[in-house]
């Protein structure tokens, strides 16, 4: 619930993924792999935003190199520092 208090949706998405990585992430060569089945709609519902917004933010995080997809399309959170 504390994540919903963050103003920018980008911060909420990043914070939620960091939480999931800290709780459920499995170490891999690139960072922490999330072996969870989450749709963009699942993330949107958890973060009180829209699926379209989640898709846009995830794309931005991938462009920054903070978020990767592995060969099985699982999310990998890289150890890059936060901005």
Residue ranges and their predicted role:
Residues 1-14:
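A small-molecule sensor/coupling module
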Residues 14-22:
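Amphipathic, well-packed alpha-helical segments that form the structural scaffold of globular domains
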Residues 22-83:
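Phosphate-/nucleic-acid-contacting segments
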């Amino acid at each position: 619930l504390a994540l919903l208090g963050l103003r920018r949706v980008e911060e909420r998405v990043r914070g939620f993924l960091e939480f999931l990585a800290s709780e459920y992430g499995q170490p891999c060569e690139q960072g922490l792999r999330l072996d969870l089945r989450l749709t963009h709609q699942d993330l949107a519902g958890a973060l009180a935003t829209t699926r379209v917004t989640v898709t846009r933010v995830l794309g931005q995080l991938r462009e920054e190199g903070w978020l990767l997809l592995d060969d099985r399309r699982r999310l990998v959170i890289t150890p890059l520092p936060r901005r």
